[in-house]
Structures are given as structure tokens and as C-alpha cells.
Amino acid sequence: MSGNGAQGTKFRISLGLPVGAIMNCADNSGARNLYIIAVKGSGSRLNRLPAASLGDMVMATVKKGKPELRKKVMPAIVVRQAKSWRRRDGVFLYFEDNAGVIANPKGEMKGSAITGPVGKECADLWPRVASNSGVVV
């Protein structure tokens, strides 16, 4: 789950993005959408599909976008998920789409800006994502 650039620990969040899910790319790197092929740090039950949630680092490929970004495996961080989850204070919330940003293994973003809101859980865990985001919810 957490790479070199992650800080702190994460409260359990409902897993909303299994391997094979396609999410929007929320940064200005030139990618349009990302296809999840693996979840970092996901140890799970035998034969269970690994799944990611808000703030997780995943390995992804670009399905639509600039040709130089396509057909390569790269790390990405999930910044929004459509599956509802519960915060420690009892509030349930969810976003209208699934979105992620392309990063390097240390958690530094490839793009320089994030479009749309970013979950607080993700911003707390990844400082570089928090500094590039406009709205943290």
C-alpha cells in the first residue's frame, strides 16, 4: 500500500477498485484513463482479486492518452473512488468517479496539477498529492 513517499498509516477503507478496473486520470500528465493491473502491498486470500481503495498505490497502464505514456507499466495513486466508505467519525461518503494520478515509486507526481477533489485519506498519506490538489474533501 504505502511506498517510500507515503507518510503515516491508513484507516481501513472499503475496497472499490479491483484489478482490471479503469479509472480516470486526474492529473495533467497527458493520460486520459488508467487500467489497474496490480495493487502494491495487497496480500489477500487465495484466488481473491486484489483490490485498491482511496490512497492506495497501484500499478497501472494508460489505455487512452499520449502515445509516449501508453503500453508502459507505471505506478499510480488512487485519489477518488465511487464506492462509499466510512470515516472514523461515522460519515459515509463517495465520489462520482474513480480517479488516480500517475506517480513514481516514491510518490512524486508526474503531472503538476490535479483536476477535481481529492480524498482527505489520500492527501494525508501522500504529501506530494496534497500539495498539487485544489480541493481536499
Swiss-Prot record:
N6,N6-dimethyllysine carried by residues: K106, K110
A GO cellular-component term linked to this record: cytosolic large ribosomal subunit
Post-translational modification remark: Methylated by RKM1 at 2 different sites, but it is unclear which are the 2 methylated residues among Lys-40, Lys-106 and/or Lys-110.
SUPFAM superfamilies noted in UniProt: Ribosomal protein L14
GO MF terms held by the record: large ribosomal subunit rRNA binding; structural constituent of ribosome
Cell location: Cytoplasm
Superkingdom of source: Eukaryota
Keyword annotations of the record: Acetylation, Cytoplasm, Methylation, Ribonucleoprotein, Ribosomal protein
Xref: InterPro entries: Ribosomal_uL14, Ribosomal_uL14_CS, Ribosomal_uL14_sf
Sections of the chain in a coiled coil: none
GO biological process: cytoplasmic translation
Modified residues (N-acetylserine): S2
Quaternary data: Component of the large ribosomal subunit (LSU). Mature yeast ribosomes consist of a small (40S) and a large (60S) subunit. The 40S small subunit contains 1 molecule of ribosomal RNA (18S rRNA) and 33 different proteins (encoded by 57 genes). The large 60S subunit contains 3 rRNA molecules (25S, 5.8S and 5S rRNA) and 46 different proteins (encoded by 81 genes).
HAMAP family tied to this protein: Ribosomal_uL14
Extra information: There are 2 genes for uL14 in yeast.
Sequence similarity: Belongs to the universal ribosomal protein uL14 family.
Function: Component of the ribosome, a large ribonucleoprotein complex responsible for the synthesis of proteins in the cell. The small ribosomal subunit (SSU) binds messenger RNAs (mRNAs) and translates the encoded message by selecting cognate aminoacyl-transfer RNA (tRNA) molecules. The large subunit (LSU) contains the ribosomal catalytic site termed the peptidyl transferase center (PTC), which catalyzes the formation of peptide bonds, thereby polymerizing the amino acids delivered by tRNAs into a polypeptide chain.
Name of this chain's protein: Large ribosomal subunit protein uL14A
Origin species: Saccharomyces cerevisiae (strain ATCC 204508 / S288c)
Gene name tied to this protein: RPL23A
